[in-house]
From Swiss-Prot:
It holds the Pfam family KH_2. Keywords: Ribonucleoprotein, Ribosomal protein, RNA-binding, rRNA-binding. Signal peptide: none annotated. Residues 224-233 have a biased composition (Basic and acidic residues). Belongs to the universal ribosomal protein uS3 family. This is Small ribosomal subunit protein uS3. One of its GO terms (molecular function) is mRNA binding. The gene is rpsC.
Amino acid sequence: MGHKVNPIGMRLQVNRTWDSRWYADTKDYGDLLLEDIKIRDYIKKGWWEHVAKRDKRPAGDAGISKIIIERPHKKCRVTIHSARPGVIIGKKGADIEGLRKKLAEITDSELHLNIVEIRKPELDARLVAESIAQQLERRVSFRRAMKRAVQNAMRMGSLGIRVNVAGRLGGAEIARTEWYREGRVPLHTLRADIDYAHAEAETAYGIIGIKTWIFKGEIMEHDPSAHDRRQQELQESGGASRPRRDR
């Protein structure tokens, strides 16, 4: 079963938690959920595409990994995790102020906007998948892009990584799937800290799907917030700790 389901969804309330962290009554739930979708879509598409077009940057240049939305009493706290926070903030904070004003128009609550830097993008499944997608759109060989991503992740301290690409690879008439793995990726082990993401590359031959799994170690405690704390520790330290082997 571990190979069939989403690894993050399978570990919710074990060592992972949701990106939307709030509670609402039945009558307000639908409105708040739609508000979350609008906020995420605007940050990833509307606002960033405008900034990228203005500054002539690639669409995924901001390196946004995830957007966490929390709703304390009559407030809305939006936290953007990005590998390039300076690109989002802009010169003298001009871009982030414009983003804050636009998001305040979407939500009726008092808005707080935070930017968190991802210091090791090579260990973030979302950024790795989007990086491979951008390379495929630039006509880089899919094998070279896959191997480069795997080597960078292992060099930065990952205990295992797997990358899948599927579609008309290399312009072939018949679509196929190829994958590359190094190290361990124990999908059946619930205590395993596995990051997963999916991205799409729009090429001249059609869409190519990319999936990445990154194994960062094991979390022994039963705590939904354990993954977030571990992420912060890995960013501050030198990467994932490798298990000892007795010889």
